[in-house]
Amino acid sequence: MSVSDPIADMLTKIRNAASAGHESVDVPSSKMKWEIISILKSEGYIKNFKKMTQEGAGNIRVFLKYDDKESSVIHGIERVSTPGRRVYLGYKSLPRVFNGYGTLIVSTSKGIITGKAAGESQVGGELICKVW
């Protein structure tokens, strides 16, 4: 079955696995997904991730992170720009996620970066998702 929005599918798999208390989740691999997951790791939302290969099909295994009370570090993860409704903003218009406690992930001409890094680099782009 083909997926019309693979990024939203990945975010949904991570959200569902985190709410179910799973240790890890596998998502189909792509360069864009790899970049998004590496930002989630650098921002402290996941423990780790690694590439898994089975019979030519590549997957990314994402190891989820939980706090002391065994609740997920990811309280919410939401797709902003979809294939049917693209959202582009300049660097001056980039919104803050939960008053700066969340992270905005933006696809820019300099690659996929956080909203904070996009503001510092003075580049706008397509809003991929927000995490808090």
Curated annotation (Swiss-Prot):
Belongs to the universal ribosomal protein uS8 family. One of its GO terms (molecular function) is rRNA binding. Keywords: Ribonucleoprotein, Ribosomal protein, RNA-binding, rRNA-binding. It comes from Treponema denticola (strain ATCC 35405 / DSM 14222 / CIP 103919 / JCM 8153 / KCTC 15104). It holds the Pfam family Ribosomal_S8. One of the primary rRNA binding proteins, it binds directly to 16S rRNA central domain where it helps coordinate assembly of the platform of the 30S subunit. One of its GO terms (biological process) is translation. One of its GO terms (cellular component) is ribosome. The keyword Transcription does not apply. This is Small ribosomal subunit protein uS8. Part of the 30S ribosomal subunit. Contacts proteins S5 and S12. InterPro entries: Ribosomal_uS8 (IPR000630), Ribosomal_uS8_sf (IPR035987). The keyword Ribosomal protein applies.
